[in-house]
Amino acid sequence: MAHPQSPGEFQILAAEGPTAGAAWTRHSNDAYPKYSALSKTHWEMWMLEGIEQTGNAGVTVTFFIDGSQTFHGNDPLHITFHALLPDGAIEKHHLIAAAVRVRETDASIVLEWPSKENGDGTEANSFSRIEVAQDHSSATATFNVPGAVQGSLALTSYTRSPDPTAGALGPAVSHRQIMTGAHAESDLSFPGSGRRLRFAGKGGHDRCWMEAAFPAILSDTTYVRGHAGPYTFASLGVVSRMGESRGRNCQKFRLLRDGVEVFASKSDTVSLTEDYFVLRSSHGGPVKGPFLDTTTGYRLDFVRPRAGKHWAFEIAHEKVWWSMPLGPPPLVREGNSGFVSKVRGGEVGGDADGETFEGAGDIGQIQMPELSTLVELKTLKAKAAAAATAPAPAEQ
């Protein structure tokens, strides 16, 4: 098992490959990496996103340190990037890194993913970077990847207090909303298409760290972040595959008004005394993903019985932002879909004259194939690769 590195400066090289165990950094700041080396089982991600509040433009980007990907022959250090432009065009990029470099100052934590084409990662001419303020007041994702994406997504938090539900979400899954809500500014260009995306909107920043490979942990996951007038809500939910929790929905929600928390809970059990949320799928709308999940939106309720408070929001998918199959059909029918959605709602009986607010949000839905299916898929790929490289039979 790899030994923990001390907090400070270190780097992770993709070429070194994963170890069997976890190299914990033991750093107290959740924006800092949890692991200082690649692991076959332990992995983590940083997600930053922003959306213009008419729903016409947005950016979502996720940075990964994920040694479990090597099981499938995939690169362990990578970034997924999706941008929606006002004319409806979509810029999608999968950026592969050779390394991750980590350093911190009194003011910030900096993580840099130098691009794989840099060989050993010693050149800095092509990279993707996150810089997060130590107090989580700001975060900036910067890209200098010629031919793909250049520019930045800058987030300035309006979240007034730390996430009270940070930590374990379910078996082998931990999560923190670094910024439940933030002002977002995008200034990005895409050399391949000659396009540019500039907008101001709202967004947030989340962190996840896992202690098992993704398909072993969960069968489904749903990510929600929405904004409507003074309100912002955010959630991550997973349906566990682990032990006695198999089939259990593990989810948390937080609701802000003007940056101040008015609701936070991990309970979706209806109660006359305890705070709870209810997230119900909607069907029959015009926009849905192409996979097994046919959800076209959600009805979301936050209830605080003792305080006599109730907030309700309608979330309706407006655009499919991305759609990625997780294997070839018919063996695999599951996938990863993202949506830009319209958000409408407010406090039930609480706002003046029952005022309803409108805005936009983004939704991510993932359904994972069974681990046995992925193992079968890996075997089929290996057989196909062997057949492709086998010498042709000699002519008689």
Curated annotation (Swiss-Prot):
Which controlled-vocabulary keywords does the entry list? Isomerase
The record, for Pfam families, names: DA_C, DA_N
Q: Which family does it belong to?
A: Belongs to the Diels-Alderase family.
UniProt KW Isomerase keyword = yes
Which InterPro entries does this chain map to? DA_C (IPR054499)
Which gene codes for it? mpsD
Task: Write out the pathway annotation from the protein's UniProt entry.
Answer: Secondary metabolite biosynthesis
Could you tell me what this protein does?
Diels-Alderase; part of the gene cluster that mediates the biosynthesis of macrophasetins, 3-decalinoyltetramic acids (DTAs) which feature a tetramate (pyrrolidine-2,4-dione) unit connected to a decalin fragment and that have potent bioactivities. The PKS-NRPS mpsA together with its associated enoylreductase partner mpsG incorporate one unit of acetyl-CoA, seven units of malonyl-CoA, and one unit of L-alanine to assemble the linear tetramic acid intermediate corresponding to the backbone of macrophasetins.
Give the EC number(s) listed in the UniProt record. Answer: 5.5.1.-
Recorded GO molecular functions are: isomerase activity
UniProt-recorded name of the protein: Diels-Alderase mpsD
